[in-house]
Regions:
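Short secondary-structure capping/turn micro-motifs that flank functional sites
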Residues: 26, 34-35, 67-68, 109-110, ...
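Structural motif corresponding to the early beta-alpha repeats
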Residues: 30-152, 156, 164
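Non-cysteine beta-strand/loop elements that form the S-adenosyl-L-methionine
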Residues: 23-29, 60-63, 103, 130, ...
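A short alpha-helix capping/helix-coil boundary motif
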Residues: 25-28, 66-70, 136-139, 174-175, ...
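Short loop/turn motifs enriched for small/polar and acidic residues
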Residues: 66, 106, 174, 211, ...
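Surface-exposed cleft-lining segments at the edges of enzyme active sites
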Residues: 135-150, 176-186, 251-252
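N-terminal ordered "arm"
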Residues: 12-14, 18-35
């Protein structure tokens, strides 16, 4: 597997720490300020060069920039304009080393939690979700069939360009994978639905981000899901994380303290021949950190990456 980590596009101490931990590749959130143009070759190249100069190879873009993706998911009057920007971005990404776009299809509200201060081991903070505490604007609404239609429309437009340039689309499950969040329908909520999604436009360039904690929240068998999608060579990217609880009430955990057998999960990836990027995700906020960005603070990443490296070495699964 390729050891990667998630970074904002501006240099930070996390870049240096990642290098010190042996991280080789970057999962990049592209700038979303008004000065950055995702269709401008010089702008995209400049972001790539920042990482290359730091010794991190850009490999995954995550997420699809919200400036375009929100319109695509809603299917509003700026959808075609937004898809055109994605089509222009794809060859620019390919020219600068990016091979994968990790994208979700949650309309209006992205990944959602009801707390960022759930107490985990030793008082560390993790994110949590309790449906009883969810507070979604009732004016936000989209139905299931519209989402399926919009996803198909998007994939039919972009997959041919992805095939041309060797870029892959890795669909991320909905988080949490509820059938509805408020009045917002969700579709990437089960193994069956995710299989349906990647079958909409059959292509070697359309697959999934195996965010394994989402499959756990679905109530799916995580190991069977890895085997199922792995047999098809449809796992393009792995989010290595875990939870404790049920679909309607769960919290994130330390990577060694959840409900999934993480050794067995890694063995499933290994046995499936997965050789793509993996990153730890949604790490605990540790003592002394300010929790400004729950799930993405610094010290917990050090622990999670070290844990992942140790497990991989123990089962003879090379990380590079």
């Amino acid at each position: 597997m390729i050891l990667s980590d998630y970074f904002l596009s501006a240099p930070s101490v996390q870049w240096q720490l990642a290098k010190q931990l042996g991280v080789s590749h970057a999962v990049v959130r592209l700038p979303e300020d008004a000065e950055f143009d995702m269709t401008n070759a010089a702008h995209v190249k400049a972001v790539a060069q920042r990482f290359q100069n730091a010794g991190l190879a850009p490999l995954v873009v995550e997420p699809m920039p919200n400036s375009v993706h929100d319109h695509i998911k809603r299917g509003d009057d700026r959808r075609d304009e937004s898809i055109e920007k994605v089509l222009k971005m794809i060859p620019l990404l390919a020219a600068n080393g990016w091979k994968i776009i990790c994208t979700n299809f949650m309309a209006e509200v992205g990944w959602y939690r009801t707390t960022g201060t759930f107490p985990e081991r030793g008082g560390a903070y993790v994110t949590g979700f309790d449906l009883r505490d969810a507070n979604i604007d009732p004016a936000l609404s989209i139905d299931e069939q519209t989402l399926w239609d919009n996803l198909r429309y998007f994939l039919k437009a972009v997959i041919p360009e992805c095939e041309k340039w060797g870029v892959k689309i890795a669909l991320h499950p909905d988080d949490p994978p509820l059938k509805k969040l408020g009045n917002l329908s969700r579709i990437l909520i089960s193994r069956e639905n995710i299989q349906k999604a990647i079958d909409l436009v059959p292509s070697p360039n359309l697959g999934i981000t195996m965010c394994q904690a989402n499959f756990a929240a679905m109530g799916e068998n995580v190991y069977e899901c890895i085997e199922h999608f792995g047999r098809q060579n449809k796992i393009f990217f792995v989010h290595f994380r875990d939870i404790s609880g049920t679909l309607e009430c769960f919290h994130e955990t330390f990577h060694d303290n959840g409900q999934t057998d993480m050794v067995r999960a890694l063995e499933c990836y290994r046995d499936a021949g997965f050789d793509g990027p993996v990153r730890t995700d949604h790490v605990p906020t540790m003592a002394g950190e300010n929790n400004d960005c729950p799930g993405y603070e610094c010290i917990g990443r050090l622990y999670a990456i070290g844990y992942l490296r140790g497990l991989a070495e123990a089962i003879g699964y090379p990380l590079y």
